[in-house]
Amino acid sequence: MASTVVAVGLTIAAAGFAGRYVLQAMKHVEPQVKQVFQSLPKSAFGGGYYRGGFEPKMTKREAALILGVSPTANKGKIRDAHRRIMLLNHPDKGGSPYIAAKINEAKDLLEGQAKK
């Protein structure tokens, strides 16, 4: 029993010293890490998403971007994409009513122009 307590105490002390060493080492490495992140291109962090607001009148391109489908997608793909996005952003589950309205508008616009 006593040897277990000693082993636990030594482990906690070793973890404390290791944590202190890591924190001190981070102070010396921090400027280098900042420099590396500043040298990376801006597109490395958010380039995969559309970075703009909504247009006053929704276009076919904008509707396709909202649903994440091709502008020439068929009705089945449009419905699947709409369902997937609305499950994530439904107003009854805490989603934005404005975004939900835009998603529905995008579906209506693309379905009106899509083929079966």
UniProtKB/Swiss-Prot annotation:
Residues 62-116 form the J domain. GO terms for biological process: protein transport; regulation of cardiolipin metabolic process. The modification N-acetylalanine is found at A2. Residues 25-116 are mitochondrial matrix. The keyword ATP-binding does not apply. It comes from the Eukaryota. Residues 2-3 are mitochondrial intermembrane. SMART domains: DnaJ. The modification Phosphoserine is found at S39, S70. It is a single-pass membrane protein. It is found in: Mitochondrion inner membrane. Mitochondrial co-chaperone which forms a complex with prohibitins to regulate cardiolipin remodeling. May be a component of the PAM complex, a complex required for the translocation of transit peptide-containing proteins from the inner membrane into the mitochondrial matrix in an ATP-dependent manner. May act as a co-chaperone that stimulate the ATP-dependent activity. This is Mitochondrial import inner membrane translocase subunit TIM14.
